[in-house]
């Protein structure tokens, strides 16, 4: 998506106009304009020149943002800072101060002496023409100061795309023109000596309304501008963390350079108390690094040689020498800024209603204002009265509140997520996450730590735990198996010395054999150990119990004598059960997907407390499972992104957990920087809060106009005598957008991890509908040889789906696999026989 800066927009009507203009350009497939950040995202093949020309022809300005791929982090960050810099507020403050200084004497001359009896200078006493001329000049001065409304308003009207400025300009101009007419008419009456007419025309002056409308709208726009600036505070705080310089090591000397001069592969140093300038890997030194700026985790992370560090994180204690691995726009910080900015430039589906209304809002208001004037004139009221009602309609109507209702909440919500290490890639993902009904959790790396650990040491009679661990350590040190690494980690933690072994041999599917001090050392599963030693009944019972708990028992013997048993398991994360419980309390069904066997899977599922367990699912089969779950409701798939890409893409919302510094996971809609499962309910909680805030904003924006426009038009005058002065209408308009933005800012007070106020959604999915497991496992993956083309795929698919109990089969001749989804137990032999009857070879079924 190409990003552009857009200038000249003042309200939702402008935004809609720009979108329509760019969408008509040949080659443009999608266009999203953000009124909040004055930016535009465009997808398609159209050239930048064509897009910019379309925007300019619509009456606005556009320029392309910095080219992607720049190696300058400072340049890219500076561009974002420039984009988010509050340029409007200082200008509006000057305009407002000047307008108020002129408005005070104008109000004094127009109303002070009549309403409160304030004295006038003697020159003006009885000099009605002088009074009118002073008001005329003061009003012209205020109009010149606020000329932006007239330039923008009439320019957009000329382009047949009236906006909020058009309403203000028309209202102020109508008041001014009618007042000028009244001044000339009064002057004529004065010349003719008709004092009754003079007094009558004096009361027809609306100069103060023309000036007051402009001043009050400026007040509102300034308040809105200040509030809008606060919606990007989270991004601004991140940008401030970006270092401007780095200390490089060149020819053994320390050289301080600008951050834009750092290149990949450069060596740099970071002293205690300094921010790390770019992403890199530690070469020398140890330290504690505070990564809260990126992940929201307040506890410092220990770093040593080989560990990765990220730009903008704080080196708290040690002296580090690092090698730059990511610079410029590739750093984690730049990617976070880019992601939040891109999300702000996209449209949430809920915004479509406001966009449709905004497209016709201003023309409709102008028509209502004209109709109001005509109706009151036909009703016998004076021109001044009818004009006041029409002007009130123009100045009270506010398309800005509608246009800002969604983007300000999206921006604040995204900022909140960014501060806590939760990245929503688009406004769509921020909206859809809160509508989740089913959460599918990949077991490894999501519910569990993803790294097997030793959970139990069970020595045989007469053997100590240390002797058992020493024997296992000696045997496993030459193995690359993940279970072996768990034993090695425990042995090293306990400081055990390495013992050399000889004649090492790995027995695939069974275990390991070697010699230590001339004695045969064996380790592995029950099938191997029963051939080497006598396994006691007590140890067999303990092994069965450990297996039921989801642990893998490894047996060890030496020269026919049992040393004991070590249980290894991929243990669940500390916060997983709490996170699952929080999801369930929110009315969400939780499903665990794993390739483990049924017994191990159910043991882990029971510990985590999930609603359903789907076992025997290999990576290729996850996508099919997600497709089935989507038939039941809105599905969020949570995985570590390593082998979950198809499933993450297939789900309604893909959530990548534990991304750390690698946040550019294309398959995911939401990226969680930390490995905490509790961030999943927190993300859903934030999405729901943001949606709720958007609904509130839209409600107040609509209700304001629904109530305000009839009141301004004088609908209630015949019944209750309620009449709205144009100045009060302008005041109401000026506050409407401010109120919407202020309401969105309340999201900054929202606590993402506070589960005490969670509301349970009404989830119509019966629990049994999620029960997709069978004794054989719900999904089986077949490895098939001989398939050469799409015709082969279709043939195998048809054969498998003809078998009773097979719901569907996803076949790929390129991968040589068939992922079979079952609704009832089907034996492997039945599947194999059916496929091989078609002259293909089944190499395996899992």
Stretches found by the model and what they are:
Residues 91-245, 356, 721-726, 732:
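Transmembrane helix-loop-helix hairpins at the membrane interface
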Residues 16, 346, 424, 436, ...:
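Conserved ATP-binding TGD loop and adjacent catalytic N/P-domain core of P-type ATPases
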Residues 26-43, 204-205, 236-330, 428-472, ...:
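Conserved cytosolic catalytic loops of P-type ATPases
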């Amino acid at each position: 998506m190409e990003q552009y800066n857009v200038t000249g927009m003042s309200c939702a009507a402008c935004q809609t106009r720009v979108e329509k203009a760019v969408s008509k350009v040949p080659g443009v497939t999608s266009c999203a304009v953000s009124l909040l950040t004055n930016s535009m995202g465009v997808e398609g093949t159209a050239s930048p020149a064509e897009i910019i020309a379309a925007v300019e022809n619509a009456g606005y300005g556009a320029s392309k943002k910095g080219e992607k791929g720049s190696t300058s982090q400072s340049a890219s960050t500076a561009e974002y800072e420039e984009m988010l810099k509050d340029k409007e507020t200082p200008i509006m403050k000057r305009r407002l101060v000047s307008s108020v200084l002129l408005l005070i004497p104008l109000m004094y001359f127009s109303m002070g002496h009549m309403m409160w009896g304030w004295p006038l200078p003697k020159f003006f006493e009885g000099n009605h023409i002088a009074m009118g001329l002073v008001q005329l000049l003061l009003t012209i001065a205020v109009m010149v100061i606020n000329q932006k409304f007239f330039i923008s308003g009439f320019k957009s009207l000329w382009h047949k795309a009236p906006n909020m400025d058009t309403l203000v300009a028309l209202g102020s101009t109508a008041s001014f023109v009618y007042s000028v007419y009244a001044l000339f008419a009064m002057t004529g009456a004065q010349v003719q000596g008709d004092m009754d007419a003079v007094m009558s025309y004096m009361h027809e002056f609306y100069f103060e309304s023309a000036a007051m409308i402009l001043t009050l709208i400026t007040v509102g726009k300034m308040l809105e501008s200040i509030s809008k600036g606060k919606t990007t505070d989270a991004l601004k705080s991140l940008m401030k963390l970006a270092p401007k310089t780095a200390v490089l090591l060149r020819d053994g000397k320390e050289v301080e350079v600008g951050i834009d001069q750092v290149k990949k592969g450069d060596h740099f140093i970071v002293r205690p108390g300094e921010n790390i300038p770019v992403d890199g890997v530690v070469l020398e030194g140890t330290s504690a690094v505070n990564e809260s700026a990126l992940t929201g985790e307040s506890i410092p992370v220990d770093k040593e040689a080989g560990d990765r560090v990220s730009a903008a994180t704080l080196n708290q204690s040690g002296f580090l020498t690092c090698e730059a691995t990511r610079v410029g726009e590739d750093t984690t910080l730049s990617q976070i800024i880019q992601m939040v900015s891109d999300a702000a430039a996209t449209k949430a589906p809920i915004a479509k209603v406001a966009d449709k209304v905004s497209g016709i809002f201003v023309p409709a208001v102008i028509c209502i204002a004209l109709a109001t004037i005509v109706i009151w004139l036909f009703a016998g009221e004076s021109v001044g009265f009818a004009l006041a009602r029409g002007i009130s309609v123009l100045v009270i109507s506010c398309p800005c509140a509608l246009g800002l209702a969604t983007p300000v909440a999206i921006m604040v919500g995204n900022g909140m997520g960014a501060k806590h290490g939760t990245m929503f890639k688009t406004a769509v993902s921020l909206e859809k996450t809160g509508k989740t009904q089913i959460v599918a959790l990949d077991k490894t790396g999501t519910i569990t730590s993803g790294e097997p650990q030793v959970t139990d040491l069970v020595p045989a009679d007469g053997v100590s735990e240390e002797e058992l661990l020493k024997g296992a350590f000696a045997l496993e040190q030459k193995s690359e198996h993940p279970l072996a690494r768990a034993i090695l980690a425990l042995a090293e933690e306990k400081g055990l010395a390495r013992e050399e072994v000889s004649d090492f041999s790995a027995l695939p599917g069974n275990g390991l054999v070697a010699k230590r001090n001339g004695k045969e050392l064996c380790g592995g599963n029950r099938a191997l150990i029963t051939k080497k030693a006598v396994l006691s009944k007590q140890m067999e019972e303990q092994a069965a119990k450990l297996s039921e708990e989801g642990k893998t028992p490894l047996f060890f013997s030496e020269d026919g004598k049992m040393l004991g048993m070590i249980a290894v398991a991929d243990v669940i994360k500390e916060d997983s059960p709490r996170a699952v419980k929080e999801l369930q309390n929110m009315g969400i069904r939780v499903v665990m997907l794993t390739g483990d066997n049924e017994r191990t899977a159910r043991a882990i599922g029971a510990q985590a407390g999930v609603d359903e367990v789907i076992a025997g699912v290999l990576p290729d089969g996850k996508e099919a499972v997600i497709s089935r779950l989507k038939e039941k409701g809105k599905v969020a798939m949570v995985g570590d992104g390593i082998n979950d890409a198809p499933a993450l893409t297939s789900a309604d919302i893909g959530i990548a957990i534990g991304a750390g510094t690698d946040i550019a996971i294309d398959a995911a809609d939401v990226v969680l920087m930390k490995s905490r499962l509790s961030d999943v309910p927190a993300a859903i909680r934030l999405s729901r809060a943001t949606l709720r805030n958007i609904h509130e904003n839209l409600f107040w924006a609509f209700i304001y106009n629904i109530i305000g426009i009839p009141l301004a038009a004088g609908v209630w005058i015949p019944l209750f005598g309620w009449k709205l002065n144009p100045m009060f209408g302008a005041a109401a308009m000026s506050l409407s957008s401010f109120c919407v933005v202020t309401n969105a800012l309340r999201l900054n007070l929202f606590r993402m991890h506070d589960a005490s106020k969670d509301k349970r959604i009404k989830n119509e999915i019966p629990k049994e509908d999620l029960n997709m497991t069978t004794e054989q496992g719900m999904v089986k993956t077949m490895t098939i040889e001989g398939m050469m083309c799409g015709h082969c795929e279709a043939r195998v698919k048809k054969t498998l789906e003809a078998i009773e109990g097979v719901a569907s089969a996803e076949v790929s001749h390129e991968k040589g696999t068939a992922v079979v989804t079952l609704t009832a137990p089907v034996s492997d032999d039945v599947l194999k026989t059916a496929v091989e009857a078609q002259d293909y070879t089944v190499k395996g079924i899992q």
